[in-house]
Amino acid sequence: GAIIIAETVYENIKNEKQYHTMQAFPGIKSKWERYDRYDFKFKNRNAIVVVPQKAAPGNPWIWRPAFFAAFPSVDIALLANGFHVAYYDLTHLYGSPHAVKLGTEFCNYMRDFYQLSSKVTVEGFSRGGFFAFNWAAQNTDRVACLYVDAPLCDLFLWPGRDNKKLWNDVLKEWNLKDNQMTEDKGKSIYRLKALAEANIPIINVCGDSDEAVPFEQHMNIIRKRYLELGGTVRVITKLGCGHHPHSLTDPTPIVNFILKYTK
């Protein structure tokens, strides 16, 4: 009703017809890498959806829970392949049960209101990787594949108890006392059985000289265990590379992997 009234007033003042057009997604519309971008709030947290010029059949999408637009070569390539690119900011929630719940609600919203695919590719960079493993293990029926890049896989190594401020942030987000943060909560390896049983494929990119999240202490442990469980995992190692830059300048191997498992 308010829209009709506004259009009528505009027409009387300007003596020209004004038509209201619905946006594809809520929020503020802008451009990102040539594509329509929508910024909005969901459950009081920042969300972004970037829309392909022509959506691929089934409306496939990739979702980042942290660090929108950082090293976006894969996202840009997938947009060209008809994927929606979504971001829902759960960066500082450390993969907590609350974060997992919010992520599920966001995915339901994207599916139910905007008809995006019921299965999503989850893209976890750094600490976003820890969330990706946690969320995927509890939502295996909603996951097409995982793309994790230099992922944090062990909260006891980062931030670790020695970093008292960040460790207290972890405990606060998890609503735990220190002695309640056990290995089955703080290590991604405990998520792998559920992922392997659901045949969730994983692609990983890591630098072999990462000092922030060392490959041998994080993703290589995941790789070995996932293979033991019969899971599909591909690791791309960048020689001489540290934690940054993430991704690949030529993202073709990652994109092809994602396309293979979203058909």
Residue ranges and their predicted role:
Residues 58-66:
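Short beta-strand element of the alpha/beta-hydrolase
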Residues 168-220, 224-227:
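The feature captures the conserved acid-bearing segment of alpha/beta-hydrolase catalytic domains
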Residues 119-166:
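Primarily recognizes the serine-hydrolase "nucleophile elbow" in alpha/beta-hydrolase
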Residues 29-34, 45, 151-152, 156-194:
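Mobile cap/lid helix-loop segments that gate and shape the active-site cleft of serine hydrolases
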Residues 16-56:
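N-terminal cap/lid segment of alpha/beta-hydrolase-fold proteins
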Residues 94-115:
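Alpha/beta-hydrolase active-site loop
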Residues 70-86:
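Short amphipathic alpha-helix adjacent to the substrate-entry channel of hydrolases
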Residues 212, 217-263:
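C-terminal catalytic histidine-bearing segment of alpha/beta-hydrolase fold enzymes
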